[in-house]
Amino acid sequence: MASLGRKFFAVGVLSRVFPSAFNAQKGLLKNASMFLTPAFRLSPSLLPWNFSRGFKVKASVKKRCSSCYFVRRKGRLYVLCKKHPRHKTRQG
């Protein structure tokens, strides 16, 4: 069932990025072969969302580089890093 939801989500994204390829009345692809060619690829710049990294949840947190620093918020210990945002962790 989850794959069905992903399929409809992908069709929604493609219909917004390439509106001329979709039939407005039925919501179906006019020319599906355009999306099956190897030359067609969605680059990250075409997607409308900017995802930011979330926190990794760990039982014990530690600094991963010299730029990392500890912050205590809402009773939890967080590690933040401006140099490497992928180092963000929170105590679980």
Curated annotation (Swiss-Prot):
GO cellular component, one term: mitochondrial large ribosomal subunit
SUPFAM superfamilies (alphabetical): Ribosomal protein L36
Keyword Mitochondrion attributed: yes
Highest taxon listed in the record's lineage: Eukaryota
BP-aspect Gene Ontology terms: mitochondrial translation
Transit peptide: 1-54
Compartments reported by the entry: Mitochondrion
Keywords: Mitochondrion, Ribonucleoprotein, Ribosomal protein, Transit peptide
InterPro entries: Mitoribosomal_bL36m, Ribosomal_bL36, Ribosomal_bL36_sp
Pfam families per record: Ribosomal_L36
An example molecular function term from Gene Ontology annotations: structural constituent of ribosome
UniProt family annotation: Belongs to the bacterial ribosomal protein bL36 family.
PANTHER family referenced in this protein's UniProt entry, alphabetically: 39S RIBOSOMAL PROTEIN L36, MITOCHONDRIAL, LARGE RIBOSOMAL SUBUNIT PROTEIN BL36M
Subunit structure: Component of the mitochondrial large ribosomal subunit (mt-LSU). Mature yeast 74S mitochondrial ribosomes consist of a small (37S) and a large (54S) subunit. The 37S small subunit contains a 15S ribosomal RNA (15S mt-rRNA) and at least 32 different proteins. The 54S large subunit contains a 21S rRNA (21S mt-rRNA) and at least 45 different proteins. bL36m has a zinc binding site.
HAMAP family cross-referenced by the UniProt entry: Ribosomal_bL36 (MF_00251)
Primary role: Component of the mitochondrial ribosome (mitoribosome), a dedicated translation machinery responsible for the synthesis of mitochondrial genome-encoded proteins, including at least some of the essential transmembrane subunits of the mitochondrial respiratory chain. The mitoribosomes are attached to the mitochondrial inner membrane and translation products are cotranslationally integrated into the membrane. bL36m may be involved in a process influencing telomere capping.
Protein name stated in the entry: Large ribosomal subunit protein bL36m
Species: Schizosaccharomyces pombe (strain 972 / ATCC 24843) (Fission yeast)
